[in-house]
From Swiss-Prot:
Subcellular location: Cytoplasm
Primary site of residence: cytoplasm
Quaternary structure annotation from Swiss-Prot or TrEMBL: Heteromultimer composed of HisG and HisZ subunits.
Official protein name in the record: ATP phosphoribosyltransferase regulatory subunit
Stated family: Belongs to the class-II aminoacyl-tRNA synthetase family. HisZ subfamily.
Further remark: This function is generally fulfilled by the C-terminal part of HisG, which is missing in some bacteria such as this one.
SUPFAM superfamilies for the chain: Class II aaRS and biotin synthetases
UniProt keywords, alphabetically: Amino-acid biosynthesis, Cytoplasm, Histidine biosynthesis
Any one GO BP annotation for this protein: L-histidine biosynthetic process
Role description: Required for the first step of histidine biosynthesis. May allow the feedback regulation of ATP phosphoribosyltransferase activity by histidine.
Pathway recorded for this protein: Amino-acid biosynthesis; L-histidine biosynthesis; L-histidine from 5-phospho-alpha-D-ribose 1-diphosphate: step 1/9
Any GO molecular function: histidine-tRNA ligase activity
């Protein structure tokens, strides 16, 4: 095998794309800061006990593991940053009241989570801790939308659901975990025949409600239909009211619902949203409420947030034009060095042409050059 071959679904990021990614990263962090979110930087490596405690089987399977050469203990490369941020909120900050945190950094997946996906996403996310009300869910959703808009994303669709609806339908149903997994899989695949087989011995209200979920997707009318079809299930009406409340406060986007969407079922504790845009094969942003995320760290308090992969985002956002640069001669002349330094302090990109490379071009388009006129260095159009 050639020495330069990289692992499957791992790739170098070349200058043009790297510049675009970095511009998006800065814009996303600036947008989060505008909402009052503070940046944190968790480590890439942690012991598995803290990295995976309370996260479920799916994240465990996605985590690349290795042995710490100093202690002999098993460590993991993070596959998701949310649990680490919850640990920071619970133990290191331990603030009373609201805490708003954001992050941006690479994660590593043992397997790609979708076709043609990278196994090294650049994950950006934001979390708000300490508020139980729907205002926190709405703020997280508004921030996610503003992040996409600041990146130049248009034609946005927000898909809403609530995992508590399925939990309400399954309340009191006595079945083993394998059957429950099958029910979840059948709902996710909208497999009516399999769901009917698995729920044959369920109470009538649960069975009929679960079967009804397969048809409860679409626009706002879905909530009206759900109110009728799920009327026999206690606790569902307030959840539908909360989804309607959220939808009514989203402007400039299309809103849909899929009440059988169980992505992140073991992780989310309430409302859940996914944001889709043209050109992306999967949701660009996923988020919602996950109140139990900090429980394993001894501080079980309300939490809502979202995350996205900037490498996925860059594929659907038009690249911004590169600011034209200034070409300058290389030399030991203190005057030209001072002129170049002054231009760079003003925010200009100045590319020095090294001897013998005058005819070469690079990514930076130069529309001006630094020339000597009457003994003074000045910028002129090329």
């Amino acid at each position: 095998m050639s020495a330069w071959v990289l692992p499957d679904h791992i790739a170098d990021v070349l200058p043009s794309e790297a510049r675009h990614i970095e511009e998006l990263r800065r814009g996303l962090l600036d947008t989060a800061r505008g909402y009052g979110y503070e940046l944190v930087m968790p480590p890439m490596l942690e012991y598995l006990e803290s990295l995976l405690t309370g996260t479920g089987e799916a994240l465990d399977l996605q985590t690349c593991k290795l042995i710490d050469q100093l202690t002999g203990r098993t460590m993991g490369l993070r596959a998701d940053t949310t649990q680490q941020v919850a640990r920071i909120d619970a133990h290191l900050l331990n603030r009373k009241g609201l805490t708003r945190l954001c992050y941006c950094g690479p994660v590593v997946h043992a397997r790609p989570d979708r076709p043609r996906a990278t196994r090294e996403p650049l994950q950006f996310g934001a979390e708000i801790y300490g508020h139980q009300g729907m205002e926190a869910d709405l703020e997280a959703l508004h921030l996610a939308l503003d992040c996409l808009r600041s990146a130049g994303v248009t034609n946005i669709n927000v898909d809403l659901a609530d995992v508590r609806i399925v939990r309400s339908l399954l309340a009191g149903v006595m079945v083993d975990m394998q059957v429950l997994r099958g029910v979840h899989a059948a709902l996710a695949a909208k497999d009516a025949s399999e769901l009917e087989r698995l729920t044959r011995d369920f109470p009538a209200a649960s069975r009929e409600g679960l079967m009804a979920l397969l048809q409860l997707y679409g626009g706002i009318e879905v909530l009206d239909r759900a109110e009728k079809l799920l009327a026999r299930t206690a606790g569902v009406q307030p959840l539908l009211d909360q989804l309607r409340w959220l939808a009514q406060r989203l402007e400039g986007v299309s809103v849909s619902f899929d009440l059988a969407d169980l992505r992140g079922y073991a992780y989310y504790s309430g409302t859940r949203f996914a944001i889709y845009v043209p050109g992306a094969s999967d949701a660009l942003v996923r988020g919602g409420r996950y109140d139990e995320v900090g429980a394993v760290f001894g501080r079980n308090r309300p939490a809502a947030g979202f995350s996205l992969d900037i490498k996925q985002l860059v594929a659907v956002v038009p690249e911004r034009p590169l600011k034209a640069a200034i070409r300058a001669p290389w030399g030991d002349d203190p005057q030209v060095a001072a002129a170049i330094a002054a231009l760079r302090r003003q925010g200009e990109t100045v590319v020095c042409v090294l001897p013998g490379h005058e005819s070469e071009v690079d990514e930076f388009h130069c529309d001006r050059e630094l020339v000597q006129v009457a003994g003074q260095w000045a910028v002129q159009a090329i």
